[in-house]
Every structure is written in C-alpha cells, then in structure tokens.
Amino acid sequence: MVKNTNLINISTYKNDVIYFEKEMHEILNNFAKYFKINKQIILDVSIVSSYTSRKLNFEYRQKDKTTDILSFGYDDFDLYDKMPFLNLGELVICNNKIKKQAIIFNHSIKREFLYLFTHGLVHLYGYDHQSEKEKKEMDFIVDSIFNPLKITRND
C-alpha cells in the first residue's frame, strides 16, 4: 500500500470550522488497507453550512432537509484500474449538523465527524444501507476502519 501519499483536499465555508486532518488521513489509510487499495487515493472534502447542505440534499436527493454528509463518488472504477491513483470523489459534510448530532448522541464532535467521514468513504466505494443486510455489512466495514483509532465518545 502507498502510505502517506494519499491526498485529502479540504475546503471550508468559513475559517473557524473544526476538522481533524491527521485522523482523516489515518482513516483513509485504514480504508486503503481494508479494501487492499495499493495506489494513491485522492479525496475531496467540503465542509459546508446548513443552508448549502440542505440545498445540495434537495438538488441531488430530492430531500428538503439538512443532512450530515453527502457523498458524490466517481463510480468509474474501471477507469481508475488503469490509473496510478484512485479518485474516490467528494464528501460534503455539514458542520452544524455534526455539532447537533454530537450533542444528541452524546458523542464528542471529533467522534461524530470522523465516524461520518468513515461512513462517507464507504459510500464512495459503492456500499449502501437500503436494506437491513446492507446496513449490517456497511456498519461492519465502517467499524473495522474506524475502531482502530480508538476514538471514544469523550475524545
């Protein structure tokens, strides 16, 4: 596996947005190891406002509400088989929704953000949770990638 060459491009809608870049890279490395990806991974992450999240959720999913994370994958994995890198796509994370959910679920913001980041990565790789069977499989994969970081509710 190509270590520490994975690239995460992060854009934020304001300067004081909190994100956890070191841990995001650790999770991306765990993701590559789990799926046996032996090339550089490129990922775009946009941290957005509630307004932008709601607007994108309506435009792309016809759901008129703010959501915690949206994933827009580059699904042409056949193309990336021929490339020296894998461009996974873009995760759009709603900063305010993460903060609210952290309170609701009694998690730290760090844990909520990074768990949803991991969840989004797995979506980008083609997994979904439309059925109970899919949900169990996806939860298992997310936990396998996330849990080695040992991030607790209080971190």
From Swiss-Prot:
Top EC category: hydrolase
Keywords, sorted A to Z: Cytoplasm, Endonuclease, Hydrolase, Metal-binding, Nuclease, Ribosome biogenesis, rRNA processing, Zinc
Domain of life assignment: Bacteria
Keyword Nuclease: yes
Localization in the cell: Cytoplasm
GO terms under biological process: rRNA processing
GO molecular-function terms, A-Z: metalloendopeptidase activity; RNA endonuclease activity; zinc ion binding
Zinc listed as a keyword: yes
GO cellular component term of the entry, any: cytoplasm
Record: residues binding Zn(2+): 119, 123, 129
InterPro entries: MetalPrtase_cat_dom_sf_prd, YbeY
EC number from the UniProt entry: 3.1.-.-
Co-factor(s): Zn(2+)
Note on cofactor: Binds 1 zinc ion.
Main location: cytoplasm
Role this protein plays: Single strand-specific metallo-endoribonuclease involved in late-stage 70S ribosome quality control and in maturation of the 3' terminus of the 16S rRNA.
UniProt xrefs under PANTHER family: ENDORIBONUCLEASE YBEY, CHLOROPLASTIC
Family classification: Belongs to the endoribonuclease YbeY family.
UniProt xrefs under HAMAP family: Endoribonucl_YbeY (MF_00009)
Protein name per UniProt: Endoribonuclease YbeY
Organism this protein belongs to: Mycoplasmopsis synoviae (strain 53)
Gene field: ybeY
